């Protein structure tokens, strides 16, 4: 596998409102633990669309991994000015991750017009990656459901790699990191 999309819940869907909240440490560690074996097996690109939450945390993780591994980060935003209505802290976070990217493009080269641009994003990313890693629990629907449904279809039709990190997997990392010996 040469390329993987990483997506999942937006931070506010998880009740997290700061990029560096305590919970983010566990989320980033979980993403890292799932990406690292893929990177060691030859993964070359991680693709995100620059959404708040899981995607930007994944971008931070890839930036850390780039210090030791030949991994690259691509940000394929669904439309221009995606972060225009975000608060200043979130715009800053998005720009910090964008500066670490090896590639950046807009899937539709115009500002937001309709939800169809999100569907276009999902289709383009799935069609141009070998798999997807989602922080998504099937028991708690949210915005990742649309990407998940489309990726599941690709898995069934074209042997697309699909891995979901659910809340149990996140809790295992929390427990592991908090163990005292």
Curated annotation (Swiss-Prot):
Pfam families documented for this protein: YpsA
InterPro entries: YspA (IPR010697)
Alphabetized SUPFAM superfamilies for the sequence: MCP/YpsA-like (SSF102405)
Similarity section: Belongs to the UPF0398 family.
Protein name: UPF0398 protein LMHCC_0668
Organism per entry: Listeria monocytogenes serotype 4a (strain HCC23)
